[in-house]
Amino acid sequence: MVLNFKKIFILVFTVILLLGSLADFVSIGYAENTTDQEKKTDDVTVLQEKSDIKSLGLAPNEVVVANGKKGSDLLDFEAFIKPSDIVDGTEPFDKSNEAGNDSSPNNGIVRTFDTVTYPLKVTINPKKHDKLKDIKLKITGTLENGITNKRVNAKFAVGGKEDLEKGIVSFDMEYTLKETGNSLMIPVTVEVQGAEHGIKLKPNIKIQVMSVEGKDILNEQIEQSFENISPVTTSGKVNVKARINQSYSTLNFRLYRAYNPNAAESNRSNVFGNTITFYIANLPYRNDLRGATFPNGKINYHFEFSGRVTWDDKSLAETVLDFESEDTPIKIFNYGDIDTEAKKIPQENTESFELGIENYMQVNPHVAFTARSYIPKDKWNADDIEKYTINSVWDSGKTEISKPEVGKEKVVYKASVKDYVIGSTFPTMHAHTTNVPSFSKNQKAFSTVAFLIHTPNEYRSLGKNNQINKPNNVYYDLKCIVDSYEDSKGNVISYNTSTSTTITERNTVNGSYSLQNAFFTPDGKELGTPNLGYSTVSKGDATTIVGQDVKMHADLNVHAVTEGGAIIVYKWNTDSFYLTKEAGERAARDIISRGYTSLLGTTISNSDKQKVYYGIARKNDNSFQAITQNKEEDYEWYTTYDEARKYGEIAAIKNDIQDMFSHGTIIERGIFFKVKTRKVGSVNEKGTPNIIATAADIFPTADRKTRYRVAENRAYNNYTEYDENGVMTKLQSPVKSSVNFETLGIMNGETSSEVTTNKTTYYSSDNVNVTVDNLVKLPGEMDFTYLDEKIEMRVKIPKGLDYVVGTAKYGDQYIEPKIEQQSDGSNHLIWYDTLTRSNKVLKKINFETRINPVLLPQGNQVGLEIQNVLSSSMDTRLEKFRTSSKNISIVKIGMVGVSETIKKLQVKKIVIMKLGCSHIQL
């Protein structure tokens, strides 16, 4: 009996120590009294000692913010926000509370781009049952001053919605408590955006019990509201930047005549496209955006344009442009939004406006290396708003410029922008795509505008200022200086930041042309490491499986007016690739239909000035040296496929453009090959490399007396090499942009997979269901009689996710994985399968993981990545090609379940004492 008493005492003492070691609160046992006595003090509820809230970590008479119905005949319900638990800001903190600073996590001040967390603590205890299950809770709320002056100052991290037109910031989230016996902490987090300095943010929060065990109890109105939470004050310092991007609307330049139909045909002046972007960045000596914010009113800035000329003849000195003498001043032809509207209207004080041009058409006006200028207002509250926010600001506002001030070496335009709208999202991608980044995480763009700059081009061959006909380059320096901004009270705040760029008029052939090559699958999939933004770039690691066809992509990039046209030769190794008659004739049609760029920026297709020919190599030499360096004269050319085949296998196609063309890209996308070689690696059965290449001859003058060969002096070092097992040992050199050859590797098989989860956002109390769909591609002509290929499927689950033993299925069978623990806290789950004659397909993997809140990274909402890697002897590509991944988001919910444990111990004194202990923030 004494022994049993000692055991009970030790057990109870251990439980007390455990409770004392937790970090915020927990409810012990059931509420003794469901009728809480309370009194009011300044509209804030003060709960008396008999309230169960005392058992949740509050001292007697501590002020809490709560009102509403706290229970029913079915259950007792407590929810509160303890003021001292509210955390306004995150580490590290500053030494002062000046604009942009915050010295403490509980001083009522929060920096911009920081967070405020309101721990909403909930306890539910049954009255008539030992336990209740599946208690559905709904938490909603709004944020006072969440939107002011066309700006979203803050938003809710989970379930948030911002209505700019109505000026309302709100949130709506649901959570299901699996069973009573757990106390709950739900963090309601406000994410401060680029708020105005000194704004007071005040959330109003409501929590309601929706249903219990599937039964709707909304009519009982069991809810708590929090409408007297003390506001926090935002702290922000303006840090606006400007950025100039060239090549607006796919143009580096176009002839002025493309925009002014009244210009003389002899006018050879140019128009360059540029964009100006206003954004904010992190304050000096900080590595994130905390404390930085946007200006409140009009931004005043100005342009300074200048220019200089450098000559290829080094005996001629660099010339600075003189706009008061022999050089015509640079002008702003027009400016406007970056959008899909092709018809552009001249703006006041621009050259187009002064000339009385009514309108003009802009080709691809949405294409730019910055964000779009606005989201259509009818899409602001659309369910698919993410389609627009990824590459667009909300509203760039109104831009105005002055008339130009022309000086000797400088042209100045004063400008301003106002009435911009700042939402809760900021663009990351280019205006014309959703997969090419334009901004880093610390760059928040809010206004973009396109400018067309008119340059006189007076230093062209035999131009007004180049009668000596010497090759040269003209550099136009464009500088944008932010002078000041106006705050919300109309005060003008002086500012000084600048950005610049240089645009070039090339009056020399060298550097004006480049060639690109790449392999693709017949259906258009890029082979090799994807090159974001421009896929027709050599990678060196392109591969395909035995027997799979490929196609060749080749580009000639043009940055100059070319009066005599060009000859482009697309060539390949005939030991590795075969061009069928159907493919050859298709390629000719494709080349002619894609055409070339006119002086006005339009595409000329199906012209009688463009011819296609089929080439037979003069020498039977498929060496690396021969293919990379063969020129037009190294082939015999024929007008038809059938005629050429009489003399051998076709080894090249010639694209002969006998017409003037301008800036743009001459594209080839239609040369389809049968892959002849079956040998693994990059060398075929005859010992020559699997390569394609492109050569080009440029004719600067219409008489074609002068020929310039693109990349004529290029050094070709090596093609990509593989060992006998198909493992890459050396990457081709040169490689990447402006390289006119590409290597293809051959593999015996190709594996791939897709990782999916049952949701994308989870609470920390949830389980994550993971599915991995594994695929294998084998050669179509393969003899499967002796197929015996072992495949490893390795799923990498990060620290914070624990595999639930017994849940794993491979196909329809429960098969437990091999588990390897990693030093970084992650785990690898490994399955194996063997491909055979009767088993040529990999199966799906399905399993569950339990979220381990203790091991999650810091923060109320965190992201994790699940990866799957396939390994085999037949697919020896780099691991990145055999890896797939899935990202999930986890919202932390604090929870500890002690009531049930204490109840089983039947230690009544512990229950009556209603011990208060801290909750672990999970």
From Swiss-Prot:
Gene Ontology cellular component list: membrane
Record keywords, A-Z: Membrane, Plasmid, Transmembrane, Transmembrane helix
Main location: membrane
Organism name: Bacillus anthracis
Bilayer-spanning residue ranges: 9-31
Superkingdom of the organism of origin: Bacteria
The protein's name in its UniProt record: Uncharacterized protein pXO2-29/pXO2-30/BXB0028/GBAA_pXO2_0028
Compartments, record wording: Membrane
Bilayer disposition of the protein: Single-pass membrane protein
